[in-house]
Swiss-Prot record:
The chain crosses the membrane at residues 1-21, 34-54, 61-80, 84-106, 118-138, 156-178. Signal peptide: none annotated. InterPro entries: NADH_UbQ_OxRdtase, ND/Mrp_TM. This is NADH-ubiquinone oxidoreductase chain 4. Its main location: mitochondrion. One of its GO terms (molecular function) is ubiquinone binding.
Amino acid sequence: PIAGSMVLAAILLKLGGYGIIRMMQVLPPTKTDMFLPFIVLALWGAILANLTCLQQTDLKSLIAYSSISHMGLVVAAIIIQTPWGLSGAMALMIAHGFTSSALFCLANTTYERTHTRILILTRGFHNILPMTTTWWLLTNLMNIATPPSLNFTSELLIMSSLFNWCPTTIILLGLSMLITASYSLHMFLSTQTGPTLLDNQTEPTHSREHLLMALHIIPLMMISMKPELII
């Protein structure tokens, strides 16, 4: 069910990061060098999850693996134990909660009209539902952390803290972000462009679907541009 996927991606997946943040406050302070294997493992796991995304043909699986790759960055940022890293991790958990939930919602919008989640069979939506294509574009741009979204702010904080801790990590981070951009572009082009395989009886989008997407996108913009709204 779509509601379960949205709650799982937006809330339940973030409980692990929240638990690590709480445990870090309880544990005695240790040298960050002790956590080097875990930071490398988290970043390498993010890259592997991103590479897995490139191999997916199922839309829902692709979005699910995308969530896993972002949580790798969150874990790496928390373990460094710097204020910037912690702020970036919390911001990315909030930002990705909105983004992944919006992507699952869009995937369900596509599934309700095509009755399939295979990427190649859902193409050509820009001819039939242009407004939905706009939502897909905005959400994918958020997923690859373009300004002025909260994703950009959080990834900038994480990148700065990781680079300050160890400049070599910029290689793993850069590779991860490059692959993220690749599969996001692949997902958008596969589902929206090209000749459509649907008939002319496709159900139009409802106002509730547009409202739902607006309630995902607007907070991401507003929290980044006016953080005093929540702080």
